[in-house]
């Protein structure tokens, strides 16, 4: 499902949701659901209820499709986590994205093969001891939110 918000002939927001099908499950929970891949409102139009209106319309459509939940993953940047909680979502999971630079790699990654020279690394950390990565500049908490319909 793709919905757009238009104001004065200009697209100012959008939401994109993929539904579970018989052939493919897109949400992590057992219930039949939809994954919100994108929800965006143009910065000049934020704070006017456009995102909430898009979400509520998407919920109406999801219910018509007999979905039981909506799932979304977001990073801790900005206020998106608070926004989802205020809009009836609950956090069910989290992990971290780690981006290691050459310098980070030199201090933390020791390949067994001396001919292997990693230059850059992306990793997902699902453990609980994130403090061990305090020296890594680029790390982001990724959070999963679920809304029951």
What are these regions (language model features)?
Residues 62-75:
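Conserved GNAT acetyl-CoA-binding A-motif
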Residues 4, 10-26, 35-40:
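Conserved beta-strand in the GNAT
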Residues 29-31:
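Short, flexible, mixed-charge acidic loops at enzyme active sites
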Residues 146-149:
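Short beta-strand-to-coil "C-cap" segments at the C-terminal boundary of structured domains/repeats
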Residues 55, 78-80, 97-103:
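Short glycine/proline-centered loop/turn elements that form peptide/ligand docking sites
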Residues 73, 90-139:
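Conserved catalytic-core motifs of GNAT/GCN5-like acyltransferases
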Residues 41, 47-62, 85-86:
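Conserved acetyl-CoA-binding loop-helix of GNAT-fold acetyltransferases
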Residues 37, 42, 46, 75:
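Residue-level recognition of the GNAT/N-acetyltransferase active site
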């Amino acid at each position: 499902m793709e919905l757009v918000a238009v104001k004065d002939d200009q697209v100012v927001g959008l939401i994109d949701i993929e539904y579970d099908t018989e052939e493919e499950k897109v949400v992590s929970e057992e219930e039949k659901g939809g994954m919100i891949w994108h929800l965006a409102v143009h910065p000049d139009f934020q704070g006017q209820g456009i995102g909430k209106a898009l979400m509520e319309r998407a919920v109406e459509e999801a219910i018509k499709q007999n979905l039981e939940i909506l799932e979304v993953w977001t990073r801790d940047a900005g206020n998106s986590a608070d926004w989802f909680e205020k809009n009836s979502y609950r956090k069910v999971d989290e992990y971290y994205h780690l981006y290691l630079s050459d310098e980070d790699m030199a201090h933390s990654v020791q390949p067994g093969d001396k001919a292997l020279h990693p230059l850059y690394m992306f990793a997902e950390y699902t453990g609980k001891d994130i403090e061990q990565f305090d020296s890594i500049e680029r790390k982001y908490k990724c959070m999963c939110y679920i809304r029951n319909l």
